[in-house]
A protein has these predicted regions:
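N-terminal and secondary-structure boundary signal
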Residues: 1-142
């Protein structure tokens, strides 16, 4: 991947040196330390998996953006839903590829949870549409 000019990010294991302070422009999320690599990338592809989340109900294309922020604890301490929305609005991926081959339908994100086969990969340029489609797969109204 790197020889072809790409990078592999593992945000949970990165130090603060890989993040850049940015003005998030939100009403709750005013500023944040955001992934430098994503900010500087020519193309930004998000690859969430379809899963249940105890705090948000679902975690897919929008909540996935939290992984690009240094202090994710702020989201949980403040207003989880609003900060997720404001973070997702800050920098939208060029493409979202949701792995919905199998979905974790209960006790996410840590599990163990119930696994259901959906046998789908979802490709879209709109992370909100991916979220809505995933909610429908889970039987929820978006």
């Amino acid at each position: 991947v790197e020889a072809a000019g790409g990078i592999i990010l593992v945000p949970n294991k990165l130090s603060l040196q890989f993040f850049k302070p940015v003005d998030a422009g939100g009403t709750v999320l005013h500023s944040m330390q955001y992934s430098k690599d994503v900010l500087e990338a020519d193309v930004f592809i998000s690859f969430p998996i379809l899963k249940h989340h105890n705090g948000t109900g679902l975690t897919m294309g929008l909540k996935n953006m939290m992984g690009l922020v240094w202090d994710r604890g702020f989201f949980h301490r403040t207003d989880l839903h609003r900060t997720i929305a404001e973070c997702a609005a800050f920098k939208k991926p060029d493409l979202v590829i949701m792995d919905a081959v199998r979905g974790i339908t209960t006790h996410g994100p840590m599990g163990p949870g119930t696994i259901r086969e959906y046998n789908q990969l979802v490709f879209c340029t709109d992370p909100v549409a991916v979220e809505a489609y995933g909610a429908e797969l889970f039987g929820d109204k978006p």
